[in-house]
A protein has these predicted regions:
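Conserved beta-strand-loop-beta-strand hairpin that lines the nucleotide-binding pocket
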Residues: 1-38, 77-78, 83-194
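Generic detection of short hydrophobic beta-strand segments and adjacent strand-loop junctions
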Residues: 36, 40-46
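General secondary-structure edge motif
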Residues: 42, 57, 61, 65, ...
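Conserved short strand/loop->alpha-helix "switch" segment adjacent to the catalytic nucleotide/phosphoryl-transfer site
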Residues: 45-81
């Protein structure tokens, strides 16, 4: 089944307020790359009618652009969040690369995430039966991404978009955690009280 056909079925299933603009339009993700906060972004359009190819290409391009600028956000984290764009039917999906590649903002105009706290806990999912045909849909993506970023000293933030939809911001510090912080964490783990 093509991504376009799947999205049409998902839209019917959820009875979305605003359908895709045209049956002829391929789903699109726009990648906005900022060299500095004062510059206009370079915009790259990633289109495709195959879900895995579109997600893979978007995640790979985002990762490459981030790394070229010195970013440290892991590929797997980027891919998990880009894959979640299926919940928004890829509606106005935008990936923004900021802060020398160390901040990546993924936004959409989908239905949004009502309970952001539970969305970051394993096992909570809004994936429909149709979505689970091509994604895991078990509520593991956001929690895994959050844990991986925390391990690197980074954060995952979920916010409402301006009118509707969601904005997920992935960020890590420009410099990796120093060696001085690692022994303290190890020492804390040795004192387990049950």
């Amino acid at each position: 089944m093509s991504l376009r056909a799947l999205l049409a079925r998902l839209i019917d299933e959820r009875r979305a307020e605003t359908p895709l603009s045209s049956d002829d339009d391929e789903p699109e993700v726009r990648l906005a790359i900022y060299d500095s906060p004062l510059s206009e972004p370079q915009v790259v359009s990633v289109r495709g009618d195959d879900f895995h190819a579109l997600v893979g290409e978007t995640a790979a391009r985002t990762y490459a652009v981030s790394r070229e600028r010195g970013g440290r956000v892991p590929y797997g984290v980027i891919r998990e969040i880009v894959e979640n764009l299926i919940h928004a039917y890829f509606r106005n999906a935008t990936v923004t690369v900021l802060d020398d590649g160390n901040a990546i903002r993924i936004s959409d105009q989908g239905p949004g995430i009502a309970d952001k706290v539970r969305a970051l806990q394993p096992g909570f999912s809004t994936a429909t039966a149709q979505m689970r045909r091509i994604i895991r849909g078990v509520g593991s993506g956001l929690p895994l991404a959050k844990e991986q970023l925390q391990f690197l000293g980074g954060t995952l933030q979920i916010e409402d978009n301006l009118e509707r939809g969601t904005v997920v911001t992935l960020s890590v510090h420009r410099d990796p955690p120093t060696a001085n912080t690692a022994p303290a964490r190890v020492a804390e783990r040795r004192h387990l009280t049950t």
